[in-house]
Amino acid sequence: MARYTGPAWKLSRRLGISLSETGKELAKRPYAPGQHGNGRKKISEYDLQLQAKQALRHMYGVNEKQFRRIFNDAGKMPGIHGENFMFLLESRLDNLVYRFGLARTRRGARQLVNHGHITVDGSRVDIASYRVKPGQVIAVREKSKNVKAIAEALEVAPATKDFVSFDAEKLEGTFVRLPERAELNDQIKEQLIVEYYSR
């Protein structure tokens, strides 16, 4: 399945969740495009599972093949499958660049990585799906520190999560540790995703 490239606000309204995690997309119209409000149609269990999967997949901007591979990797880890799945998504390089506030969206963060603006432990990494390990340092390359999009993103960046640290002067941050479930989006129902793939 191809990666969605349309307006994020429209997809957020269709899925009923803020994909940017800011809530702005749903502030005025918290219902699907084309509707005048929430309908009374009964939603099946399968539809709920599919919607949960699509919401998480689009939130992190991952195509179906990558999404399923990460899900399978999470199943090999000790602990709760659904939570481990979210932790692995959080450890993607593009997501951490977004968490640092270096880009306004995960899509923008992915472009920064793909265009070679980011290093991990001093080495340039241009693979957005690169899985960062706790303790690794992510930084903007010296020659990329004047990129306008980065400066603009930092001006409106929200506070960083406790599982990362970021130095705005040096434009570098550390993936301190894996997050705890309570630190991540509580609108995501990862157990429904586990059920979807267990059908």
UniProtKB/Swiss-Prot annotation:
What PROSITE patterns does the record tag this protein with? RIBOSOMAL_S4, S4
Q: Name one GO cellular component term.
A: small ribosomal subunit
Q: Name one GO molecular function term.
A: structural constituent of ribosome
Which controlled-vocabulary keywords does the entry list?
Answer: Ribonucleoprotein, Ribosomal protein, RNA-binding, rRNA-binding
Q: Does the keyword Transmembrane helix apply?
A: no
The S4 RNA-binding domain, residue ranges:
91-151
Do you know which HAMAP family this protein is assigned to? Ribosomal_uS4_B
The family database entries (PANTHER family) matched by this protein are listed as: 30S 40S RIBOSOMAL PROTEIN, SMALL RIBOSOMAL SUBUNIT PROTEIN US4M
Protein name according to UniProt: Small ribosomal subunit protein uS4
Q: Which organism is it from?
A: Exiguobacterium sp. (strain ATCC BAA-1283 / AT1b)
Q: Species lineage, top-down?
A: Bacteria, Bacillati, Bacillota, Bacilli, Bacillales
